[in-house]
């Protein structure tokens, strides 16, 4: 029979399908040849088996059909064993057969395998693998230190196959077992049904051996198993087959949880987190590798068992030390940022180096690039937190517990001393980057309910913030994980203990956590930004001056400027990532809605329309910490300074902010802290359209904000609120805190130009006199004789006075300009006796320095350098006088200003008006007013002479003037005139005689003395009228 016929017979045999190929059938026959000869006498022929014979295909081996048929069952088993051997070789790339490859068919077997020589010797004649010895074979393969040295060719092909060598000789056993798992999965989809159980068993063996490897890694020489696990996951993420790896890991984790006798599951997995920690801490924000590691952690936070280990792993050694949280794995991630790692040290900082050598466009491109990475980074952190919150009640409790403890341990970040002692600060608390990133992630968690009309928003329960004295178990039951909030000052004092619910929802916890995080992080960074900005301006001026004078300090100043500019750009970039800002604005607008609803007594889940007058129910505000409102204001002020385009693109939501400002600015019942209410004026100034700014394509327009303001339905109530807070400023703090009061009033001026309202303000420009003296000394050369140190001190003093003078002059320009504007329409408020005295005193004091004998003291080299505009001031003051001059009471009050008024003061003012070319009608009107006031002054002089001999009982003890409305002070029991004590209390809320606290409602009229004074006055008047 020819070879062709022989092959045809094989192919027609129904049992040929048991073999992988014709060559395999021949090989099988060769293996059986000797066995059949030995057994031919013992195995009788069976006619039933003849139909299934394969003898026709084996003529060349001299076998008959009957001989093959008699041993069918044996043959079938052998065929199956042969296929199992091949399958094991394909899955595990190992073999016991090192025979000549030319004798092997090459069909169905891998091209390269690791030859297990020791095991082959041990098994002697058996050169195939089966299910009884495969586990031993796998173990032997895993113990090989260099499997690449044991590779053999399984086929006669001479083609170089590097991938086959790499796969079979894989040295890293964890990666090897994963590859075996993948090959086993593939086999399961391909093998015949009779081999399927064996393929599944092989797959299970990869899992069980991986479990063994993880439980006893010490027995595998030079194998860092946990490093391999991390590297495998890293490679899978980068190669887009991560799901395959996680499928494998899921089964391994399940197997590990079933066998914790040798090592517990956390003990097995903690080394993995150690590796991630050591690798991540050295990565930068803009390194792609960072995001692959974050994806690994994202998987771990989705996998319930790994998530538990992760949460256990990130617990700090000392929970009361805020800085320790930064050293945990989650803390290390949160610390990654474009901010400086070591404050003030720009060396080795990867961002914005040598900014003066970069064009604005290059800086903008770098900023945009960082923002892209930041957005991705914040999304990863958010997903991690979200996974842990949603995975199970246990993981939710653990991550909230961690966050609550972390914020409590870092509460000291807000203390004043913390900013003044940075070296101690950074040993005690987590970094600014930590809180900025945490805040960004928490903001994302809040977005589902950060919509003005969200019903979920109003489920926030403020009593959460005043709970105290809870143990850990109670916190878990009630879902209260924040600590120490009960020590925070609330918007108003509580009059009664609130009713606490059984537990709190996640909206309440999220809002409280997020707001406090922003308070600890964003708020502090904003303060730093402002200071950096101021220092940059100061350095720039000093650098320019040094260059002009060819000072050797110029280079040093330039270096300082470069370093500070790097810090500024890094900080600004970190704080202005667009999505974070938008999320924060969404939160703050929602907070404005929430606080307004609480302020009008709404305790339901649906918002109530705002209407005036406001209802009385607002007790819930007693449980809302002040920093909720402070954050809102601080963020909007930040946007105005550093990211104004966000305000314009979100203008429609600003109406809710206006509602908040309208209600709280003028309502001491709803917001007790006058400093906080005064700050709301700055918030209003921040969100209002600034129509005087220079148009620029890079600066957003104000069209949308203008529309919101023009259509605001509660403009009258907003103006009234501003008036109230303006008055309250006079009752705030120490009477000598001029700078603070300047800051409070400054934002009100542009607001009052834009919306009707009113205010008055007093300030001093005496600093100009000090500048004048120092400039004279400098010009005369008197400074040249000073030592360098003394000269520097003088220069610094001059610069300081110049800054102060510029600051005060801006305030004076704004104050007087606003008053001249307002008094054209509003008069009654300004002619009130208490207020009129203060306004007149201020105006006369100005005139005395602007047109009187002291005017020379205010002449400096360059008025514009200090924003000093004397001509405009004189004109505005005269306008105020003319606006209010029709009021008899006001005119009569002018001469009573004994400090600055004199009969010649107004005459000198007329002379200056002519000199600065003011209109003739204005000059004539002011001259007439001056004559009228002089007449009233003469009349008052005559009256004072008439009453000059009044007894001391009738005289005010402070002013030594005759009292018209005597009142008794409750503490000191001293009698003073009502106008005197009222004026005193505007700036100092104490009894002037014993410094006891005092308010106007505590004083009592001295009716008896008043009647005595009136009788005496009547008698004196009668005596004067009688002819001598």
Swiss-Prot record:
Top enzyme category: transferase
Annotated compartments: Cytoplasm
Alphabetized UniProt keyword annotations: Acetylation, Cytoplasm, Transferase, Ubl conjugation pathway
Main location: cytoplasm
Tagged with keyword Repressor: no
Pathway entry: Protein modification; protein ubiquitination
InterPro entries, A to Z: Ub_conjug_fac_E4_core (IPR019474), UBE4 (IPR045132), Ubox_domain (IPR003613), Znf_RING/FYVE/PHD (IPR013083)
Domain of life: Eukaryota
GO cellular component, one term: cytoplasm
Region of interest (Disordered), ranges: 33-57
GO molecular function: ubiquitin protein ligase activity; ubiquitin-ubiquitin ligase activity
U-box domain residues: 949-1023
One annotated GO biological process: protein polyubiquitination
UniProt modified residues of type N6-acetyllysine: 386
Sequence similarity: Belongs to the ubiquitin conjugation factor E4 family.
Domain note: The U-box domain is required for the ubiquitin protein ligase activity.
Function: Ubiquitin-protein ligase that probably functions as an E3 ligase in conjunction with specific E1 and E2 ligases. May also function as an E4 ligase mediating the assembly of polyubiquitin chains on substrates ubiquitinated by another E3 ubiquitin ligase. Mediates 'Lys-48'-linked polyubiquitination of substrates.
Protein's recorded name: Ubiquitin conjugation factor E4 A
Top-level taxonomy: Eukaryota, Metazoa, Chordata, Craniata, Vertebrata
């Amino acid at each position: 029979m020819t070879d062709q016929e022989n092959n045809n017979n094989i192919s027609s045999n129904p049992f040929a399908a048991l073999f992988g190929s014709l060559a395999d059938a021949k090989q099988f026959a060769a293996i059986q040849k000797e066995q059949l000869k030995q057994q031919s006498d013992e195995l009788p022929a069976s006619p039933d088996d003849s139909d299934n014979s394969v003898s026709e295909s084996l003529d060349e081996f001299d076998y008959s059909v009957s001989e093959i048929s008699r041993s069918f069952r044996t043959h079938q088993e052998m065929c199956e064993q042969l296929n199992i051997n091949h399958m094991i070789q394909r899955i595990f790339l190992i073999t016991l057969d090192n025979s000549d490859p030319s004798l092997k068919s090459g069909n169905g077997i891998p091209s390269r395998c690791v030859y297990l020589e020791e095991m082959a010797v041990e098994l002697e004649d058996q050169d195939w693998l089966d299910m009884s010895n495969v586990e031993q074979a796998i173990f032997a393969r895993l113990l090989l230190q260099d499997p690449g040295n044991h590779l053999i060719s399984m086929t006669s092909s001479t083609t170089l196959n590097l991938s086959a060598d790499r796969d079979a000789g894989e040295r890293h056993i964890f990666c090897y077992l994963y590859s075996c798992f993948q090959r086993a999965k593939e086999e399961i989809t391909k093998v015949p049904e009779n081999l399927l159980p064996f393929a599944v068993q092989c797959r299970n063996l990869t899992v069980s051996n991986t479990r063994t490897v993880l439980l006893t890694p010490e027995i595998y020489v030079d194998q860092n198993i946990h490093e391999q696990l991390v590297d495998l996951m890293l490679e899978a993420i980068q190669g887009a087959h991560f799901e395959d790896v996680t499928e494998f890991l899921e089964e391994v984790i399940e197997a590990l949880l079933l066998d914790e006798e040798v090592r517990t599951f956390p003990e097995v997995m903690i080394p993995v987190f150690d590796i991630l920690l050591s690798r991540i801490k050295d990565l930068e924000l803009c390194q792609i590798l960072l995001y692959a590691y974050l994806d690994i952690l994202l998987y771990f936070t989705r996998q319930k068992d790994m998530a538990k280990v992760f949460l256990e792993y990130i617990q700090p050694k000392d929970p009361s030390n805020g800085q320790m949280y930064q050293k945990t794995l989650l803390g290390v991630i949160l610390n990654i940022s474009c901010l400086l790692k070591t404050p003030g040290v720009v060396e080795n900082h990867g961002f914005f180096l040598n900014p003066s050598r970069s064009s604005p466009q290059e800086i903008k491109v770098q900023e945009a690039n960082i923002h892209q990475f930041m957005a991705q980074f914040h999304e990863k952190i958010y997903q991690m937190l979200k996974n842990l919150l949603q995975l199970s009640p246990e993981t939710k409790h653990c991550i909230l517990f961690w966050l609550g403890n972390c914020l409590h341990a870092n509460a000291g970040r807000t203390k004043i001393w913390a900013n003044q002692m940075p070296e101690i600060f950074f040993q005690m608390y987590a970094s600014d980057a930590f809180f900025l990133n945490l805040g960004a992630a928490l903001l994302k968690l809040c977005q589902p309910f950060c919509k003005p009309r969200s019903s979920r928003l109003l489920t926030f329960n403020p009593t959460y913030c005043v709970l105290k004295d809870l143990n850990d178990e109670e916190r878990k039951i009630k879902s209260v994980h924040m600590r120490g909030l009960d020590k925070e000052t609330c918007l108003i004092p509580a009059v009664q203990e609130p009713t606490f619910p059984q537990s709190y929802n996640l909206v309440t916890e999220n809002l409280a956590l997020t707001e406090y995080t922003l308070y600890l992080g964003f708020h502090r960074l904003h303060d730093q930004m402002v200071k950096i900005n101021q220092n940059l301006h100061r350095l720039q001026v000093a650098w320019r001056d040094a260059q002009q004078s060819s000072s050797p300090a110029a280079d040093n100043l330039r270096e300082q400027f470069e370093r500070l500019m790097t810090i500024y750009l890094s900080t600004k970039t970190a704080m202005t990532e667009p999505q974070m800002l938008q999320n924060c604005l969404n939160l703050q607008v929602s907070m404005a809605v929430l606080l307004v609803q609480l302020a009008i007594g709404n305790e339901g889940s649906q918002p109530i329309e705002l209407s005036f007058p406001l209802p009385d129910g607002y007790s819930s505000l007693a449980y809302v910490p002040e920093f909720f409102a402070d954050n809102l204001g601080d963020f909007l002020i930040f946007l105005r300074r550093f990211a104004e385009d966000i305000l314009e693109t979100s203008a429609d939501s600003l109406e809710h902010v206006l509602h908040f400002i309208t209600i709280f600015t003028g309502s001491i019942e709803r917001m007790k802290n006058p400093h906080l209410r005064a700050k709301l004026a700055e918030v209003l100034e921040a969100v209002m359209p600034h129509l005087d700014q220079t148009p620029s394509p890079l600066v957003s327009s104000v069209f949308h904000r203008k529309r919101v303001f023009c259509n605001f339905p509660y403009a009258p109530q907003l103006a009234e609120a501003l008036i109230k807070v303006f008055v309250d400023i006079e009752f705030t703090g120490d009477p000598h805190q001029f700078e603070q009061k300047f800051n409070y009033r400054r934002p009100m001026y542009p607001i009052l130009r834009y919306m009707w309202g009113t205010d008055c303000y007093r300030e001093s420009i005496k600093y100009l006199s000090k500048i004048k003296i120092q400039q004279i000394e400098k010009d005369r050369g008197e400074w040249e004789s000073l030592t360098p140190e003394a000269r520097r001190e003088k220069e610094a003093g001059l610069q300081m006075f110049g800054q102060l003078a510029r600051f005060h002059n801006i305030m004076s320009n704004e104050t007087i300009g606003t008053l001249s504007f307002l008094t054209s329409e509003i008069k009654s408020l300004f002619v009130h006796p208490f207020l009129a005295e203060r306004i007149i005193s201020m105006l006369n004091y100005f005139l005395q320095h602007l047109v009187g004998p002291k005017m020379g003291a205010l002449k400096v080299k360059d008025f514009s350098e200090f924003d000093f505009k004397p001509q405009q001031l004189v004109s505005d003051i005269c306008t105020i006088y003319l606006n209010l001059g029709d009021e008899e009471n006001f005119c009569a009050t002018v001469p009573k200003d004994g400090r600055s008024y004199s009969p010649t003061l107004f005459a000198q003012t007329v002379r200056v008006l002519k000199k600065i070319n003011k209109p003739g009608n204005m000059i004539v009107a002011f001259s007439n007013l001056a004559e009228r006031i002089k007449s009233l002054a003469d009349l008052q002089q005559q009256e004072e002479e008439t009453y000059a001999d009044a007894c001391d009982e009738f005289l005010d003890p402070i002013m030594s003037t005759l009292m018209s409305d005597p009142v008794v002070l409750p503490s000191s029991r001293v009698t003073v005139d009502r106008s005197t004590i009222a004026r005193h209390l505007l700036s100092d809320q104490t009894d002037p005689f014993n410094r006891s606290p005092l308010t106007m409602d505590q004083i009592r009229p001295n009716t008896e003395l008043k009647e005595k004074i009136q009788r005496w006055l009547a008698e004196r008047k009668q005596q004067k009228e009688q002819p001598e």
